[in-house]
Amino acid sequence: WGPIVAQYVGAALLALGLVGVGVWASSVARSQITAFILGVAVMFVLILFGLDPLIVGLPPTLGTIAANLGVLSHFQNMGRGVIDLRDAIYFLSLAGVFLALAYGTLLGRKLAPGRAARRRLVVGVALAVATLVVVNLMGSHINGRLDLTPGHMYTLSSGTKQIVDALPDV
C-alpha cells in the first residue's frame, strides 16, 4: 500500500500546485477562455521543463535549473513510492507563489494606481514571492525522505552505507 499512498500524496500536491496556477490565470484574465488558455500554457511549460529531451539539449547549468523548475522531476519520486520533503516543498511553494500573485492581482484592482496602499501591496506580494522562492531554494538542501516501497527499495541499507563511507575519495 505504500507506493499507492505516496502516489496519492504526490497527485494531491501536484494538483495543489497546478490549481494555484489556474487561480492566478483566472485572476489575470478577464475571460474564462483566456484564463483557461493561459493556465494551460503555464502548466504546459512547467511540465515541459521536466522532460528529458529538453533537459539533455540544454547546457548543464540550464538543464539543472529547468529540471528543478519542472513538475515532472518532482513528481517522479512520488510516483515510485518515495515522498521527498524537497518535492513537497516545491509543490507547496509553487502553489504559494501563484496564489500570492493572484491575491496581488485581485486586490490591486480595488486600489487606486500610484497610491501608497497599492505600492505596499506590490512590495508585500513581491516579498511573499521572494520568500517562497528562497524557501524552495533552501528546501533543496533538506534531506527528508519517506520510502514507502516494499523493502525500502530506494533506501540504502546500513551495510551499504558503511561500505560507501569506507571508500576513498578520488
Short names for language-model regions:
Residues 114-141:
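Internal/C-terminal transmembrane anchor helices
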Residues 29, 33, 50-58, 105-113, ...:
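Membrane-interfacial segments
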Residues 4-9, 36-37, 88-92, 122-126:
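Hydrophobic alpha-helical transmembrane segments
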Residues 36-105:
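Terminal transmembrane helical anchor/hairpin motif
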Residues 134-170:
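Juxtamembrane extramembrane loops of integral membrane proteins
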Residues 8-17, 41-47, 125-130:
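Small-residue-enriched core segments of transmembrane alpha-helices in multipass membrane transport
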Residues 1-30:
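Secretory targeting signals
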Residues 21, 101-102, 131:
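Hydrophobic/aromatic residues in alpha-helical transmembrane segments
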